[in-house]
């Protein structure tokens, strides 16, 4: 009996330590696809030069509710001509418990949520490229944790540089 109460107490403690997190909605906020060099681009030998840009923004909607927007821009050039320009704003509304501390919240908004959104954005880009009859584009996974850590390190260095300049 005492063991059962101890197990129940441990389970309750684990539930209290878990962060409340829920996905309310994932949606395409904005989609753009351009082929400025068509139809001439289709006659050129396909030697693409792909450039990818990622951006993450977040906004507090209400207490504990955040919109995170992952912007994925793919620009593909053949020689000096833009074959296509694809931009997808993949968004999500997430509930994050009030018990989350600032550093943990920044990590969830800057890394965890974009990791959830990226497969949707990647699929959208792939479908748009396919519909435009270009060769298939399969984007590699992105390590948002590493990007977030690098961003935090750059901010810390800038803050330290600012303090040194002010001294």
Swiss-Prot record:
Q: In its keyword annotation, does this UniProt entry include DNA damage? A: no
| InterPro entries in alphabetical order | SecB, SecB-like_sf
The alphabetical list of record keywords is:
Chaperone, Cytoplasm, Protein transport, Translocation, Transport
Instruction: Tell me the GO BP annotations in alphabetical order.
Output: protein folding; protein tetramerization; protein transport
Question: SUPFAM superfamilies recorded for this chain?
Answer: SecB-like (SSF54611)
Chief site of localization: cytoplasm
Subcellular location as annotated: Cytoplasm
Membrane found in the keyword field: no
* Highest taxon of source: Bacteria
Gene Ontology molecular function terms on file: unfolded protein binding
A GO term from the CC aspect = cytoplasm
One Pfam family hit: SecB
Q: How does it assemble?
A: Homotetramer, a dimer of dimers. One homotetramer interacts with 1 SecA dimer.
Q: Which family does it belong to?
A: Belongs to the SecB family.
Q: What's this protein's function?
A: One of the proteins required for the normal export of preproteins out of the cell cytoplasm. It is a molecular chaperone that binds to a subset of precursor proteins, maintaining them in a translocation-competent state. It also specifically binds to its receptor SecA.
- What name goes with this protein? Protein-export protein SecB
Species annotation: Idiomarina loihiensis (strain ATCC BAA-735 / DSM 15497 / L2-TR)
Q: Which gene encodes it?
A: secB
């Amino acid at each position: 009996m005492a063991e059962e109460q101890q197990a129940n107490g441990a389970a309750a403690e684990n539930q209290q330590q878990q962060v409340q997190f829920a996905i309310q909605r994932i949606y395409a906020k904005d989609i753009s696809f351009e082929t400025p060099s068509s139809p001439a681009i289709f006659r050129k030998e396909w030697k693409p030069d792909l450039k990818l840009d990622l951006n993450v923004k977040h906004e507090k909607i209400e207490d504990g509710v955040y919109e995170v927007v992952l912007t994925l821009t793919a620009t593909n050039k053949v020689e000096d001509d833009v074959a296509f320009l694809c931009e997808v704003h993949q968004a999500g509304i997430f509930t994050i418990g009030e018990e989350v501390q600032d550093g943990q919240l920044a990590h969830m908004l800057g890394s965890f949520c974009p990791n959830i959104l990226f497969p949707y954005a990647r699929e959208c880009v792939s479908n748009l490229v396919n519909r435009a009859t270009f060769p298939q584009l399969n984007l590699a996974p992105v390590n948002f944790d590493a990007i977030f850590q690098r961003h935090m390190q750059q901010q810390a260095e800038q803050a330290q540089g600012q303090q040194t300049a002010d001294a």
